[in-house]
């Protein structure tokens, strides 16, 4: 039999050398670690400032919270009202509702997302449970995009980019506006 010195013999020699120096368990362990790491990759935090508009994007440069947010306790229809520190949507105050109730013709979603907001009036921090009002067309007035304390989608209870209308009465999946009731003191 003639000795082959070509490509096949080099690959065979490499395979035999690798097999003699490494174990199957080590390979399977590394492969398992790679697969688990690949599966966990989507759970890493994501910087989503690039999808925001120009002025909003410029306001968030260098920080994930909105730069210059000064909470006030005078006008509940303003985006800077202290309860709206992490709201992303239309204020129900401007759409026929109140801070704690939906406008007529819309229904309250059973789901909520939470945030802690600072009230400059009494210098306390409160837990706010934002809830969407659903079932009517989007109000379109008093639209606020506040991202203070918002976390990526893998922590949905602290994310304000999700439309929380699933589970609303009568399959009312259309977002209308958002209320911001106080749950209690945060500290």
Curated annotation (Swiss-Prot):
Which pathway does UniProt place it in?
One-carbon metabolism; methylamine degradation; formaldehyde from methylamine: step 1/1
Q: Where in the cell is it found?
A: Periplasm
One GO MF term: aliphatic amine dehydrogenase activity
Q: How is the cofactor bound?
A: Uses a protein-derived tryptophan tryptophylquinone (TTQ) cofactor.
- Gene Ontology cellular component annotations, sorted alphabetically: outer membrane-bounded periplasmic space
Identify the stretch annotated as signal peptide in this record: 1-57
Q: Which cofactor does it need?
A: tryptophan tryptophylquinone residue
EC number(s) per entry:
1.4.9.1
Can you tell me which family this protein belongs to?
Answer: Belongs to the aromatic amine dehydrogenase light chain family.
The UniProt function text for this chain reads: Methylamine dehydrogenase carries out the oxidation of methylamine. Electrons are passed from methylamine dehydrogenase to amicyanin.
Q: What is this protein called?
A: Methylamine dehydrogenase light chain
Q: Which gene encodes it?
A: mauA
């Amino acid at each position: 039999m003639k000795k082959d010195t070509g490509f096949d013999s080099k690959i065979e020699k490499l395979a035999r050398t690798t097999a003699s120096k490494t174990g199957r368990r080590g390979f399977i362990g590394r492969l398992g670690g790679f697969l688990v790491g690949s599966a966990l990759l989507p759970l890493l935090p994501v910087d989503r400032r690039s999808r925001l508009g120009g002025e909003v994007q410029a306001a968030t440069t260098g920080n994930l919270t909105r730069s210059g947010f000064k909470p006030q306790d005078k006008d509940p229809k303003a985006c800077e009202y202290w309860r709206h520190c992490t709201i992303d949507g239309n204020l129900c105050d401007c759409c026929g509702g109140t801070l704690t109730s939906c406008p007529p013709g819309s229904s309250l979603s059973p789901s909520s997302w939470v945030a802690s907001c600072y009230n400059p009036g009494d210098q306390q921090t409160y837990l706010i449970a934002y809830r969407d009002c659903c079932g009517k067309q989007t109000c379109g007035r008093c639209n606020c995009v506040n991202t203070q304390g918002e976390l990526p989608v893998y922590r949905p209870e602290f994310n304000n980019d999700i439309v929380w209308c699933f589970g609303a009465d009568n399959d009312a999946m259309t977002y209308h506006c958002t209320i911001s009731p106080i749950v209690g003191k945060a500290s």
